[in-house]
Amino acid sequence: MLLKQVVEAHAASNGSAGARSIAMMVTQAGIPLSRYRAGRRMKQLGLTSTQPPSHRYKKADQPHLAIPNLLDREFDVTVPNKTWAGDITYLWTGARWAYLAVVIDLFSRKPVGWALSLSPNTDLVKKALLMAYESRGEPKGVLFHSDQGCQYTSQGFRQLLWRYRMTQSLSRRGNCWDNAPTERFFRSLKTEWVPAIGYPSIATAKSSIIEYMVGYYSSLRPHKHNDGLPPNEIEKKYWNAQKAVARNT
């Protein structure tokens, strides 16, 4: 039974999970398993973690706007839909690069909006924000943080933030650590899931990335920020606690 759970956890991660992640996933499934025991079982089964090095997308900064870094690396957010962070990366799709924009809720580190396109333009980040806004029930007063990429400082994107009544925050120029959660998400995506040679087509890339974000990262993958729980589980825990409080008031 244990060996079967280890194999299933490894397969669910697309072969990327190491002993620590497999131990958390199997334990969450109801079978207590330590990291070291997971490592021994992986060795017994001939399972390894395949995580190639990442490659960062270079962005064009637009530092002329007087928009402060309101987030100021305060990444520990206690409420969903309070602070979102956006970023762009690129993926090889057979004959050319495709560009992925995501929106991450910093409470759970869950990707709540995304868009994939052959052009890293303003429409790309607007589509990702629109998806996040609609899928999260059109929340009010969200702080949206990003780097100073031209897509995020464009008039079109800033107007969309204004329409949604969101406040904009920008990283300092050239400082990737000001948006560390999205950088870490992209690193996880590329090292855990994306094939080393990329995808054969943009359609294949889209299907695979959705599977990662929805089926694995949000639902199954243990996250250190959430004390080992996947984003969906930590959000479920939060909302259940809110319902309990409401019943008792």
Feature roles, as predicted:
Residues 1-79, 175, 230-241:
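Basic, flexible linker segments flanking DNA-binding modules
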Residues 162-166, 188-249:
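C-terminal domain-tail junction helix/linker
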Residues 6, 22, 38, 42, ...:
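Mobile genetic element proteins and their domesticated derivatives, centered on retroelements
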Residues 58-62, 146-148, 154-158, 170-190, ...:
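RNase H-like two-metal-ion nuclease catalytic core shared by retroviral integrases
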Residues 12-15, 75-77, 93-94, 148, ...:
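Conserved, non-catalytic sequence blocks in retroelement Pol enzymes and Pol-derived host proteins
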